[in-house]
Swiss-Prot record:
Protein name: UPF0758 protein Sez_1052
Location of the motif JAMM motif: 173-186
Listed InterPro entries: MPN (IPR037518), RadC_JAB (IPR025657), RuvA_2-like (IPR010994), UPF0758 (IPR001405), UPF0758_CS (IPR020891), UPF0758_N (IPR046778)
Statement: the UniProt record of this protein carries the keyword Transport: no
Positions contributing to Zn(2+) binding: H173, H175, D186
Alphabetic keyword roster: Hydrolase, Metal-binding, Metalloprotease, Protease, Zinc
PANTHER family: DNA REPAIR PROTEIN RADC, UPF0758 PROTEIN YEES-RELATED
MF terms in GO: metal ion binding; metallopeptidase activity
Gene Ontology terms describing biological process: proteolysis
SUPFAM superfamilies for this protein: RuvA domain 2-like
Origin: domain of life: Bacteria
Gene3D superfamilies recorded: Cytidine Deaminase, domain 2
Amino acid sequence: MYSIKTDHKLMPRERLIRLGPEKLSNQELLAILLRTGNKEKHVLELSAYLLSSLDSLADLKKFSLQELQRLSGIGKVKAIEIKAMLELADRIQIAGQAVAAPVLSSAQVAEKMMIELGDKQQEHLVAIYLDSQNKIIEEKTIFIGTVRKSIAEPREILYYACKNMATSLIVVHNHPSGLTKPSANDYHFTEKIKRSCDYLGLICLDHIIVSKHGYYSFREKSDLF
């Protein structure tokens, strides 16, 4: 059996070349990303230490840059590389879920966006632009900020709608608290964006609030649509 204590000659990179990435352990894959260890730990020992600080592999996403840097052997550069890897993995997953089929329901959009935004610790507002066949032209992040800051203005959303020559759009934002119940500001914003779309001849199909575990659709549950 492969052992980091007895076999440093056959390193993870060589094992990946010889056996393929699917044969490597989480420890070995992480060691490839970390590249080097430090004076106290070999890179495989460092990756094992990092993984031992997690309840599950998914918890790695929850570490901020600062929290990663506080772990022994993980400096600023390694922390940045880990965060970049996690973000890229998220984007690859999202891109893989994109289909050419038309958007048929709010639930379909909500399921996708729960995966994309559910774990975000800041509020993200995303506009999804569709053509006349309800196929997605572009998904655009309009706003990233804290819950204390006001949400994006409709003009920012409409600018990209015109740029994409969209027929309709869906607005989605997350609640970092995990609660999807809309606030008074959410209602006000929904009214504003719907009026603005009506004025320009665009169709606002829905405004959806998501968290990791659920969603709220203004089209499904309010009288605004």
